[in-house]
């Protein structure tokens, strides 16, 4: 089998039609040489729909508090609109893409996170469905909606989801696409390399804040559990250029 990479696409890139189109074109080229699992979130689209439906939501340490109404909107946006838009874009580039959520076939089972509502923390990956898709040369496009042991939907952070899948499938590389040039220092300059041992310090001294916290924690966890290379890159610069921050052991 070709070497596997896991790519996480999300943030405001999901609302940038031009950037998304270019990204999918690049991904189609990469898919000729490597197996790919594409994981996506879509926070801005979820926020847009929540505002449209006059539903309030809040964030706790970069993670969205998810009540029943928020969960319903999140599942609609992630498993529906965003997932199928990405699949359509890949199909147009002659990639055999299949859109699923992490809930399908109980691919990722989570435990509910305290104080965050219907938010899940992955505890088990069932690889069968995704393995079948990869073996048959399909590119899985996976929305960040998972489930608990009783098949109840849970909103799972897409960075965390990408990390656990990269670990489970022993990915050669994990790439997080963002709308910034990687992790920035206090002078807004890109930190080109971060050692895992320094991650907690960078969070404590507030160099890393907000939505970048779960992202960098996912990077560190992936490296600790065997993924060789993890990148946080500027999606606007493209996957091939790899402009951003690399996290290493």
State the predicted function of each range:
Residues 1-249:
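C-terminal catalytic "cap/lid" subdomain
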């Amino acid at each position: 089998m070709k070497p596997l990479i896991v790519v996480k696409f999300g943030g405001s890139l999901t609302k940038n039609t031009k950037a998304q189109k270019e990204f999918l074109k690049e991904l189609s080229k990469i898919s000729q040489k490597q197996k790919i699992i594409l994981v996506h979130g879509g926070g801005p689209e979820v926020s847009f729909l929540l505002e449209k439906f006059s539903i309030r939501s809040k964030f706790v340490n970069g993670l969205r508090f998810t009540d029943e109404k928020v969960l319903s909107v999140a599942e609609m946006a992630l498993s529906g609109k965003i997932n199928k838009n990405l699949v359509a874009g890949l199909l147009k580039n002659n990639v055999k893409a299949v859109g699923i959520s992490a809930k399908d076939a109980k691919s990722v089972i989570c435990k509910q996170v305290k104080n965050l509502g219907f938010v899940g923390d992955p505890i088990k990956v069932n690889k069968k469905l995704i393995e079948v898709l990869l073996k048959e040369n399909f590119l899985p496009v996976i929305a960040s909606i998972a489930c608990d042991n009783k098949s109840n939907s849970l909103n799972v952070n897409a960075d965390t989801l990408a990390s656990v899948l990269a670990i489970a499938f022993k990915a050669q590389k994990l790439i997080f696409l963002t709308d910034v040039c990687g992790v920035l220092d206090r002078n807004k300059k890109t930190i080109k390399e971060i050692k895992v041992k320094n991650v907690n310090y960078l969070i404590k001294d507030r160099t890393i804040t907000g939505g970048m916290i779960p992202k960098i924690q996912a990077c560190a966890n992936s490296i600790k559990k065997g993924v060789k290379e993890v990148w946080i890159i500027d999606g606007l610069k493209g996957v091939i250029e790899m402009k951003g921050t690399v996290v290493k052991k």
